[in-house]
Amino acid sequence: MASSQGKNELKLADWMATLPESMHSIPLTNLAIPGSHDSFSFYIDEASPVGPEQPETVQNFVSVFGTVAKKLMRKWLATQTMNFTGQLGAGIRYFDLRISTKPRDPDNELYFAHGLFSAKVNEGLEEINAFLTDHHKEVVFLDFNHFYGMQKYHHEKLVQMLKDIYGNKMCPAIFAQEVSLKYLWEKDYQVLVFYHSPVALEVPFLWPGQMMPAPWANTTDPEKLIQFLQASITERRKKGSFFISQVVLTPKASTVVKGVASGLRETITERALPAMMQWVRTQKPGESGINIVTADFVELGDFISTVIKLNYVFDEGEANT
């Protein structure tokens, strides 16, 4: 068993740097890593237009009810309260990123988006980079998994932005099982960029999206979610990729209508938290266990420290198999 020394005194901002030496050579695919769902949604611009991915019914709802509709949408679209710096300082190392252009934007600016628009992408990436510069042994996963209204030019712009901001901090795509903290530290790499677009095949530092699978339960029922999470882990491929367990409940339209004024956090997340956290506590990382675990409102229920502490109690033999 890995040593439990220090696990009760976690330095969350530097938790990777302070892992026991025995874990430095373990593939990152076999560690437990906390992440956030819709990581950028702590800021949603109610003055912005509705995102282009939203169905016509939502577009019409907003066109009729305007700002009131957007305020209600925000209660259900905002899945985080901490900004990137806050999440990083609290221990989050995986970021779920969705990128969009704005209709008729002459500047062709790129924004984070989930229903409504969030901050400019370059601002968020710079914020993450500032943390990495101050914490040179911490490693982040940037998962660009949805693109809305983006043409070839926009992808080229985003790729150049990543180069300009992160430069040599980015780890080129290799076999996932070769990536350990030791490997990354030796080469001064701190950023793994996953890109769910064919563009990834053309750029050495973009990891193909299929190397970061994230099965989605799409349910409001905590019991069904836990069954789904357990089944997904059981089916996890033995080698070859990272793996995300989304400990996330997804509201149905009827759920939103019933709790329209209270929002996602109060209506769903907080009520289901005990059951979801109990599942997390019983997991272990390793080839046939969890890897990256994501959640809404990551500050709730000691989620982050609970995931990190799993690294101190798992069977080292299995992790190195």
UniProtKB/Swiss-Prot annotation:
Pfam families in UniProt: PI-PLC-X
Keyword match Manganese: no
Primary site of residence: cytoplasm
Matches recorded under Gene3D superfamilies: Phosphatidylinositol (PI) phosphodiesterase (3.20.20.190)
Tissue expression pattern: Expressed at highest levels in heart. Also detected in kidney, lung, small intestine and colon. Expressed at very low levels, if any, in leukocytes, thymus and skeletal muscle.
Keywords, comma-separated and alphabetical: Cytoplasm, Hydrolase, Lipid degradation, Lipid metabolism, Transducer
Keyword Lipid metabolism in record: yes
InterPro entries: PI-PLC_domain (IPR051057), PLC-like_Pdiesterase_TIM-brl (IPR017946), PLCXD1/2/3 (IPR042158), PLipase_C_PInositol-sp_X_dom (IPR000909)
Subcellular location: Cytoplasm
Active site: H37, H114
Limits of the PI-PLC X-box domain: 22-197
A single BP term in Gene Ontology: signal transduction
Gene Ontology molecular function: any one: phosphoric diester hydrolase activity
GO CC, one annotated term: cytoplasm
Protein name, UniProt field: PI-PLC X domain-containing protein 3
Organism: Homo sapiens
Gene: PLCXD3
